[in-house]
């Protein structure tokens, strides 16, 4: 859908993988991977969705 999809946020207690698999957030920022977007969402009031796979 055009609004984006929620990131799949598994338990990130162990930290995020270093694998570069970029996703474009609905905030216009490119995140290194879905997990890093999840970590950012934990700091926000309004979660960022994934607009598309790949860099913005």
From Swiss-Prot:
InterPro entries: Kazal_dom, Kazal_dom_sf, Prot_inh_Kazal-m. The record marks 18-19 as: Reactive bond for trypsin. Disulfide bonds join 9-38, 16-35, 24-56. One of its GO terms (cellular component) is extracellular region. It is found in: Secreted. CDD domains: KAZAL_PSTI. Keywords: Disulfide bond, Protease inhibitor, Secreted, Serine protease inhibitor. GO terms for molecular function: serine-type endopeptidase inhibitor activity. Residues 3-56 form the Kazal-like domain. The record marks 20-21 as: Necessary for sperm binding. SUPFAM superfamilies: Kazal-type serine protease inhibitors. It comes from the Eukaryota. Gene3D superfamilies: 3.30.60.30. Serine protease inhibitor which exhibits anti-trypsin activity. In the pancreas, protects against trypsin-catalyzed premature activation of zymogens. PANTHER family: SERINE PROTEASE INHIBITOR, SERINE PROTEASE INHIBITOR KAZAL-TYPE 1. This is Serine protease inhibitor Kazal-type 1. It comes from Equus caballus.
């Amino acid at each position: 859908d055009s609004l984006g999809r929620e990131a799949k946020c598994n338990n990130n207690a162990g930290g995020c993988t270093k694998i570069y698999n970029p996703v474009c957030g609905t905030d216009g920022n490119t995140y290194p991977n879905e997990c890093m977007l999840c970590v950012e969402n934990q700091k926000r009031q309004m979660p960022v969705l994934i607009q598309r796979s790949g860099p913005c």
